[in-house]
Amino acid sequence: MADIVFGFGTSHSPLLSTPPNKWHLRVEADKKNPSLEYRGKSYVFDELVKLRAKESLDYQSSLPVRAERHDASQLSIVKLSEHLEKVDPDVLIIIGNDQREVFEENNTPAISMIYGENVNHLSIPPERLANMPPGIAIAAKGCSAEQDISYPIDSDLSTHIISSLTKDHFDLCAMKSLPDGPRGPRGMSHAYGFIYRRIMKKPIPAVHVCLNTFYQPNQPTASRCVALGKAIGRAVNNYNRNLRVAVCGSGGLSHFVIDEEFDQRVNQGLKTLDMNLLASLPEEYFISGTSEIKNWITTAAIVNEGGLKNSMLDYIPCYRSEAGTGNAMGFMTW
């Protein structure tokens, strides 16, 4: 039988691949954003500066603090990579999401999985890099491939999980391969690319589970993510091959406006594997990048089915402006 032997969560923010003295390049975009989401409401930049004036965010977004937290985040990534290498699983289940890299508005499945033999990880052509907004091209190296490459999918386990989820009343999109786009074949979303570029030291056969965390109207709720994770965990436990299975949640924590108070509630649920707490988190907080926490919630429910316990939690809020914009980084193992 298959065994769930290791789980981890990691942020995949562009800031993790951007030198701290370049974080300001995205602040101009923050200032132009008419809908900075914070605690269930939308703000403009100056409104957040006023609202959060007592939090010393000008200091927290200063270059020395940015550099310190960037360095701490890099150490956490190294720890995750070394831990995964030491565990050396046969398969890695990656719970991620898409931000219009694969799915477009005319077809956005709530839950999708690949069951083919491989998945593409594509490089970004120089002409596309040149046309990217300030700060994005710098960070692209953290998620995109240096050159086009294909990685193995555990097709048999993926098919088993899809069939098992269907019996558990989950209606999901099953793909032999990712859909083609206007430029031809598409590659994996950056939520997955980060794991291959920054965490894996060697290719590991994988299972890709994609959640629509970002886009209305069909995002799975937190409680549905708990149920999904439990169902995936049961499917793995009932699989009749002797496999050592690891699980990863990619994304989060709160961004693009950091909310440390909410993150601490989330982290408490993740650390203690309190499924009731995680399932009851308010949906209005899961907007924009913060919605990627649902990838972690699903992962936590899977590892809970495997009987694992929390062994590491690094929480590093990386502010880039006095409005509280940036990304709260999280790195966790079970």
Region locations from a protein language model:
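N-terminal low-complexity, Ser/Thr- and acidic-residue-enriched intrinsically disordered segments
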Residues: S13, E82, G96-D98, N107
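Short catalytic/ligand-binding loop motif for oxyanion handling, primarily in non-cytosolic enzymes
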Residues: L15-T18, R100-E105, S254-I258
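Short, glycine/charge-rich beta-strand/loop segments that flank catalytic centers
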Residues: D90, I94-F103, S177-R183
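Glycine-rich loop at the start of a catalytic domain that most often binds anionic cofactors/ligands
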Residues: E104-I114
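Basic polyanion-binding and macromolecular-assembly surfaces
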Residues: L243-V245, F256, G289
